[in-house]
Each structure stands twice: as C-alpha cells, then as structure tokens.
C-alpha cells in the first residue's frame, strides 16, 4: 500500500518535471543561438534573423505582419523563447489548485529549477 502511494506521488511530478526540463532545453537553445551561433542561416543566426520580421528583411519597409504575437514564426531565437514560455506555463498550470504545506512549494520550486537548468545545459552546450 505504501509503495502504491509513493508511486502515485512520484507520477504526479513527472509531467511538470518533464515540462520544466524541456523549457530549460528551449532556453539553452536560445542562449546558444544568441551567443554561439555562427552559421549563415537566415532563420537560426540571430545576427541576421532579426530582419525576418520586416518586409523583404528591410526595417525601412515596415513589419511583415501587425502586432508581435506571431514573432516566434520569424526566427529561431523567438521560436525557442515561445517554446520555453509555453512549457513553463504548462508546468505551472498542472500544479494550480493543489493545496500543500508552504515548504513543499519551496522544495518543488528548487527541484524544478534544478531540472530546468539540466535541460538548459544539455542544449546550450550543443552550440
């Protein structure tokens, strides 16, 4: 019976832990692109991809589309940022509504932060 309860407790952390891990991976890719990417790729290289949000890649011609809600479709850095934010919000939403002792939030927060940093370092080192 105790084993069954422990397994149930562990299972409820798998989804949010997986989400923050993937979010960390997206953030690692963001920073890798920003600081270490040197290939001449119009979508992934931030030195040139920032122009993708403008008509004909020319800021003087104005933006490709109105607003900034689709900017994640214009370059790799913003796509990774969108993924990081989406997976982080997913992890937060999975825990809403559960009543816990105050210290459990601290332990969970530190645990998820550690898992997130592992995901970050795995992808950041790819660049």
Give names to the regions the model predicted.
Residues 9-127:
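Catalytic phosphate/metal-binding cores of nucleic-acid and nucleotide-processing enzymes, i.e., regions
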Residues 1-11:
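Bacterial Sec-dependent N-terminal signal peptides
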């Amino acid at each position: 019976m105790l084993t069954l309860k422990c397994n149930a407790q562990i299972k409820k952390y798998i989804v949010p832990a997986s989400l923050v891990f993937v979010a960390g991976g997206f953030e690692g890719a963001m920073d890798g692109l920003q600081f270490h990417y040197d290939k001449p790729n119009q979508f992934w290289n931030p030195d040139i991809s920032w122009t993708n949000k403008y008509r004909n890649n020319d800021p003087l011609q104005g933006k490709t589309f109105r607003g900034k809600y689709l900017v994640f479709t214009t370059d790799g850095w913003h796509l990774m940022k969108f993924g990081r934010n989406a997976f982080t919000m997913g992890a937060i939403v999975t825990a809403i509504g559960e009543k816990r002792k105050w210290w459990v939030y601290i332990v969970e927060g530190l645990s998820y932060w550690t898992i997130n940093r592992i995901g970050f370092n795995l992808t950041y080192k790819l660049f």
